[in-house]
Amino acid sequence: MRSFLYGVLAFAVLARSSAVAAFPIPDESRPLSKTSPDTVAPRSLRIEAQEVIQSGRGDGYGGFWKNVAQSTNKIVKRPDIKIGKLIEAAKKAKAKMTKS
């Protein structure tokens, strides 16, 4: 039983030392996975409300993207609302409600 314990202990020490030798510095492997924004290739991922429109048969083109829904990224001009006028109108309406 004691020899089995020594064998397991030796295996654990060897496994740990080989794992440590594989990555001696924990942050050493990270620079390979990190990329700067200027080197990242632009990605063309399909987003919601897009579909592939097939081109003619046998012409060698696989298709192109068509935007099915209208874009929601448009800037919408908000109406100019005078808060003071709204408060005055609310006070007048409240006064009418209390009189009747």
Curated annotation (Swiss-Prot):
Protein location: Secreted; Host cell membrane
Motif placement: Calmodulin-binding motif: 78-82
Keywords assigned by UniProt, alphabetized: Host cell membrane, Host membrane, Membrane, Secreted, Signal, Virulence
Induction field: Expression is induced during host plant infection.
Motif window: RxLR-dEER: 43-57
Location (main, coarse): secreted
Superkingdom, taxonomy of origin: Eukaryota
Gene Ontology cellular-component terms listed: extracellular region; host cell plasma membrane; membrane
Signal peptide range in chain numbering: 1-22
Subunit relationships: Interacts with the host papain-like cysteine protease C14. Interacts with the host calmodulin.
The protein's role, per its UniProt record: Secreted effector that acts as an elicitor of hypersensitive response (HR) specifically on plants carrying defense protein Rpi-blb2. Enhances P.infestans colonization of Nicotiana benthamiana leaves. Interacts with, and subsequently prevents secretion into the apoplast of the host papain-like cysteine protease C14, thus promoting virulence by interfering with the execution of host defenses. Associates with calmodulin at the host plasma membrane to interfere with plant defense-associated calcium signaling in hosts.
Family classification: Belongs to the RxLR effector family.
Other facts: The Avrblb2 protein of Phytophthora infestans is a polymorphic member of the RXLR class of secreted effectors. Especially, the polymorphic amino acid at position 69 is critical for activation of Rpi-blb2 hypersensitivity. The Avrblb2 homologs that are recognized by Rpi-blb2 have 'Val-69', 'Ala-69', or 'Ile-69', whereas the those that are not recognized have 'Phe-69'.
Domain text: The RxLR-dEER motif acts to carry the protein into the host cell cytoplasm through binding to cell surface phosphatidylinositol-3-phosphate. The motif is not required for perception by defense protein Rpi-blb2.
UniProt-recorded name of the protein: RxLR effector protein Avrblb2
Organism: Phytophthora infestans (strain T30-4)
Upper lineage: Eukaryota, Sar, Stramenopiles, Oomycota, Peronosporales
